[in-house]
Amino acid sequence: ALGVLLYGPKEYHALGRVHSLPSKEKLSEIIEMFTGEIFQKPPQRSAVVRQTRTRTIYELELIEQKERLLLTRILCEAGTYIRKLYYDIGEVLGPGGTMIELRRSRVDQFHEKDGLVTLHELADAFAIWEEKKDDTKLMGMIKPVELALSELKSVVIRDSAVDAMCHGAQLA
């Protein structure tokens, strides 16, 4: 389950500002340039070694442009730095760009529209459960672990083999 959440594709909605006012044509050209496989060096403050690596931007969509403000939807490979993506787009446009806001709207098969909740909402539901002993809201937020595992392949074994499997027996 953790692998799905960590390594699955992510979707973000981001608001950023570029320092020059791009034409619609130039913006379309840049969006095309940053879609697909890109090279990205993690930002100065990151938890990983700062060496250039490839990341895949599956979809980069301009939702709205209001002068220098760009609202985008980005579907990308795990490990992509969106703040750095905005910086790089700004560098190509000249003289730079910054991300202002970022919201993750999807992790692999888990979509925001399917009932994902914020940590704040979860904390509120937990507080209600603690104070009033009412778990209705909390139980509505908790999903079965099988949901996270649904994309993984499964293996069916005989009941008689369960004990041996639990002690390291080979499948084949």
Give residue ranges: language-model regions.
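Short, conserved charged micro-motifs
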Residues: L21-E29
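Aspartyl protease active-site motif detector
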Residues: R73-L93
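Charged, alpha-helix-enriched surfaces in structured cytosolic catalytic cores
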Residues: P9, P22, T80, K84, ...
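Short beta-strand-to-loop capping motifs
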Residues: G16-S20, I74-C76
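Intrinsically disordered, low-complexity polar/charged tails and linkers
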Residues: F34-E37, L85
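Accessory RNA 3′-end/elbow-binding domains used by RNA modification enzymes
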Residues: G8, H13-L15, I30-M33, R45-T52, ...
